[in-house]
Amino acid sequence: MKITYPSIDKLLSRVNSRYSLSVLAAKRAHEIQAGAPLALKHYKSDKAVGKALEEIAAGKVTIDPEHREDIG
């Protein structure tokens, strides 16, 4: 699968590693699938992972420094 939007460069500017990005996106996607409120009004993606990546790119979802050990 190739990610074209949001760009990987924009996503990596929000987190410090690809590993942290993948864990953060997966956790947020699970929250979205479980019915958590969405952080944006409009999404390009229909899938939870795509929505999570869009939220990360927009700066709406970040890693909490106090719980950083949960991410890696």
UniProtKB/Swiss-Prot annotation:
Gene3D superfamilies: 3.90.940.10. GO terms for molecular function: DNA binding; DNA-directed RNA polymerase activity. Its EC number is 2.7.7.6. GO terms for biological process: DNA-templated transcription. Keywords: DNA-directed RNA polymerase, Nucleotidyltransferase, Transcription, Transferase. The RNAP catalytic core consists of 2 alpha, 1 beta, 1 beta' and 1 omega subunit. When a sigma factor is associated with the core the holoenzyme is formed, which can initiate transcription. Belongs to the RNA polymerase subunit omega family. This is DNA-directed RNA polymerase subunit omega. It comes from Lactobacillus gasseri (strain ATCC 33323 / DSM 20243 / BCRC 14619 / CIP 102991 / JCM 1131 / KCTC 3163 / NCIMB 11718 / NCTC 13722 / AM63). The gene is rpoZ.
